[in-house]
Every structure is written in C-alpha cells, then in structure tokens.
Amino acid sequence: MKILLANKFYYRRGGDCIYMLNLEKLLKAHGHEVAVFAMDYPENLDTPWKKYFPKNMSKLMAFTRPFGDGEVKSKFLQLLNDFKPDVVHLNNIHTQLSPLIAKLAHEYGAKVVWTLHDTKLVCPCYTCMRNGKWCEECFTDKLAVVKHRCMPGSIPGAIVGYLEAKKWNKEVLQKYVDWFLPPSKFMLDTCVKGGYSPEKFKVLCNFIDVTKLPELSSKTQVKEDYYVYLGRVNEVKGVRTLCKAAAQLDKKLIVIGDGELLPELKETYKNCSHIEFKGQMQWEEFMPILQKARMMVLPAEWSENNPLTVIESQSLGTPVLGANIGGIPELIVEGGKSAAAMVPNGMTFTSGDVEDLKDKIEKTFAHDFDYQAIAKDAIERYSSEAYYHKLMEYYK
C-alpha cells in the first residue's frame, strides 16, 4: 500500500510530530511505501520528499494560505500525481498546510483518514480554553474567537481563525474525510458536541515503539526516591502548580522539558534543593530517569487529549499521577481493572488544586504498585503492532 502522511512539522517538536515519525517507521517496517508532506522548516529531518514541502509562511501568507490556492495546492497536487497514494493520513495540518489537502486527496481518489491531536475541528484556537477555563462558545458561534481575541496576533489572528473555521466547517470536512481517528473518547465526545457525526469517528489510542523500550526484568521493579514531570514547561501544562506543591514536600522532583516558564521557575526555586530542572532531553537521555522514578506527574490545566508521556511512563513501569481532565483519566486505573488497564497504574487529582496534588503525591509514593505488571500491561495495550492492525481496518 502507498501511504502519504501529512503534518505541518517533520521533526520531533511535539506529540503530533513524534506520532507521525513513529507511524512512518511502523508502516515502512510492514512493507508499505510511505511519503510525507510537511512545511519546509530548517529543523526538519532529511527526507527525499523535501522538494514537495511548501516554504515557511510570511505574515501575509499566514492570512491567505488557509483558504486555498498557492504553493500548498500546487506542491501537494504534484506529490499526489507523482506518488499516487492509496491512503492520505492527515495529522496537524491547519493554518500552515490547511484542510485544503483533505479536499485535494479526496478528489484525487485516495482514502482520507485524520488523526486528531487537538480540538481545532471545533475550536479555532485549538484548545477550547479561554482565560484558563474550558470554553465551548465556538461550537455554536464561530465569531466568538474574534469577540474574545482568542488567537495569537489578537484581532488579525482571530479573524484568520474565524474565516478558516467557516470555510472548512464540519459539513465540508466530513464530506472529504473517510475516518476521523481521535486517540481518546474525550476527543470524540468533544467533536460530537461540536456538531460532528459520531459515525465518522473511531477512537484509536496512541502507540509506542516497543523496540525502544528496555526488556522487562527485575530491574523494572527497582525505583528510586524521586518523581518526574516530563513535557513543555508552560502555564497550561500545570508546571507552576506542580512546583508550588513540590516545594512543600520533602520528595525530589525532576522537571524534564523546556518552555516559556522555565527561566522564571528556575529563578523562583533556585534555593529549593529538591526541585531539579533538567531542561530539554532526548528519549535516550530521559528514559533511564523516567524508568527509575516512583511516578510521573501530569498536572495539566487544559484538556490533554491522549498524552504520549503517560503511555511512555506506564510502558516503563512508572505509575502516573494525572490531572482529572480531558483524556488523561482514560489512561489511568486507580484500583482493580478497566478498559484502560488490567492493573492499577496511577492516581488522579483535581486539576489546579495544589492541596489535592500534594496529598496525591504522598499517597502515590505510599502505594505499593506492581511496576513490572504496569509495564507488561502497557506494552501489550499500546504496542505498535496492536495499533497497526487496528489502523489497517480504516485504511482499507
């Protein structure tokens, strides 16, 4: 099968990018011919498909590209005609690439599937968040993004968001896309609440490349007396709340990741000996730290979809203490078993609540988890092979 993967970035920038790179590797391992379509960023990985990548946008292009013609259209059509894909698998494409490519792929005759990494289909600003709170106003009134100036760039950015949402509305996109693949029930429910037909959706949880994991052994049971945060260091990720809680406890917290809050937090907690900021790290660097941690904390203050960090942590046998928001609780079992796991693999707490977070950190440290069972269950549940066979059902 010939499969064309599309994402605006072709480097390890965020969860959507990591997902697509892992998917490319997985599909090639199964003998499929894979092409990629992305923006031409200097950070991109080397690829023979680079000649088809549209150039990065000027500010003027940012206002016109989401609506149709231009380099995206010409280069994508060239790639369709040269590669002749059976399937076009979309990821994070809005604004820079635009949903235009869904229309072009459909008209070409390819099967079109779209993995949803955020709530952009129902919220022009991607997050369904306004002033730190969940917002559904755009579900029924797309002008709300202009009224509240929700997009970067204030009014001009909001106008672009509004016009893009009007042009590529749910009726149009459902006509051009065969399957939307939300990784969480939360994402499915959000899109349906925003007016999409549930018949067009199939929940397909993210996966992990098990070949990059260490073998299960007695070492999986060996944990050290610290806990970890892994991800972007910004407000919506809840890192400020986590540091407030951690400063009042005597357990060591290791923060792995970069972001706009990092300089401020490093300065604020420079005299707090049990909070350590590692900055950005690659998998090979942070994997041993994550594997030996007593837990990974995900203190999100916005509705995360299907966080890869949860899947990575559990696959290493590390329990997750996650905020009870978005799709996070779907991945955590606090007792017994459920659709999420066959063994207890973490706890949840009230998002943004420092006192509840402190309490749950202490309870998670005190709990007797079976780390090896957590890893075994997660590897079986999130393995790339299990994912591949489910995905093929939607490619046919």
PLM regions: where:
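N-terminal subdomain of nucleotide-sugar transferases
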Residues: 1-42, 81-83, 108-111, 247
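Carbohydrate-associated surface elements
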Residues: 186, 207
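Nucleotide-activated donor-binding/catalytic signature segment of Leloir-type glycosyltransferases, i.e.
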Residues: 264-288
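A charged, aromatic-enriched C-terminal amphipathic alpha-helix characteristic of glycosyltransferases
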Residues: 366-395
